[in-house]
Amino acid sequence: MTPVVALVGRPNVGKSTLFNRLTRTRDALVADFPGLTRDRKYGHANIAGYDFIVIDTGGIDGTEEGVEEKMAEQSLLAIEEADVVLFLVDARAGLVPADIGIAQYLRQREKTTVVVANKTDGIDADSHCAEFYQLGLGEVEQIAAAQGRGVTQLIDQVLAPLGEQLNADQAVENEENSANEEADEWDTDFDFENEDDTALLDEALEEETEESIEDKNIKIAIVGRPNVGKSTLTNRILGEERVVVYDMPGTTRDSIYIPMERDGQQYTIIDTAGVRKRGKVNLAVEKFSVIKTLQAIQDANVVLLTIDAREGISDQDLSLLGFILNAGRSLVIVVNKWDGLSQDIKDQVKSELDRRLDFIDFARVHFISALHGSGVGNLFDSVKEAYACATQKNSTSMLTRILRMAADEHQPPLVNGRRVKLKYAHPGGYNPPIIVIHGNQVEKLADSYKRYLSNYFRKSLKIIGSPIRIQFQEGNNPFAGKKNKLTPSQLRKRKRLMKFIKKSKK
């Protein structure tokens, strides 16, 4: 399961700055769910090879009536959900009573807590941070979140002790990256025009991903806003009342994993808690965790994003969709409650979906009624199609041919007067499909050309329902950093030119 890291502390100690640094976004948001609690933000991060979910909370100000009684509820829930709590303090402001109160609360919760002294740039960090050892929470880590100094080392030290939970995630990533490393080693020795050489490379790449592809149990996560019919759809798929259904948002509090078999194929259906709007649910229902939904997305092979046809697509849906795409999961759009709508309303809903979801035209869209069962059976065809596309094996020779066809039809743009050269492509991973393109100056390719390549590969490989990721590897220049040694005649000529230039300036 993806680990969870919560950022807590007083106001203005740099929690949001660190959140932005970890999630690599400037809007403090990778998956924003306004209304879960007023100031909590969720994001997906990958630092030092570790995948994790990070929670940014509002500042805790307990200086007036005590932290124990006035701890902000969003921070309380974040602490409960987290595997590790990063307790941020301000190294410049020093230790204040609110820090002591927060530390006392954290010690009572017996959560893995790391004290992080932020804003250590431009000061004698060791002397300023010494007083934070009074908090009794162990070592004090020093960072400067605004500049990013110490952040990678912090995450490496914090997440490494989680052991097996993280090793499994890191092993999957290593499997995807190992193919890239092998191809880099063979770049100069292999002839990618030679079928025997490319066959050997493909065989090596297959060994890295064979185990994950051969897992035939397809995990399907059903996600969406509250009361869009997720549990009703789950029960309709299962053919029995396995999940409580009630016409009130927030009935499902946790992610429920249910195994099933259909036409000889093993599935695991994951019914998740809804992601609700601000002020739409009462305090008792607010205790369910959206973290479970985010983790279910990470754990799934295919995600069914369920939308209420009567309410249309909302910003909540788009936020959730962004998290699904960032996680690289296959996607099927399910528009529920389609029954009983007039043809004019149906046309209006379809037009709105086309307008707001034009950037995911690769995903199948199904219009169903989970209550009556119409259209539900067709979902499995799209699920199997998306999973097959996400895990299909492509040879190096095929990908290289497609790359050259794309370059022939639309040549890469000039960079500083030189044409970007695309050498070859090979598979770099599966679920989602990763294509690694090697060449010269590829890091300078315009985003528009990268999108062109992505769309060209998708069309050529007929990938439906799955995002596709393209990574670029710069070819090593053997002459980089080297200077030609001038001959004596060249040195004399250079001196004459320098003298001429100096005289001209006078």
From Swiss-Prot:
Binding site for GTP 2: 224-231, 271-275, 336-339
Positions of the KH-like domain: 392-476
Residues where GTP 1 binds: 9-16, 56-60, 118-121
Biological process annotations from GO: ribosome biogenesis
A GO term for molecular function: GTP binding
Quaternary state and interactors: Associates with the 50S ribosomal subunit.
UniProt similarity note: Belongs to the TRAFAC class TrmE-Era-EngA-EngB-Septin-like GTPase superfamily. EngA (Der) GTPase family.
Record's protein name: GTPase Der
Organism (species): Actinobacillus pleuropneumoniae serotype 7 (strain AP76)
The encoding gene: der
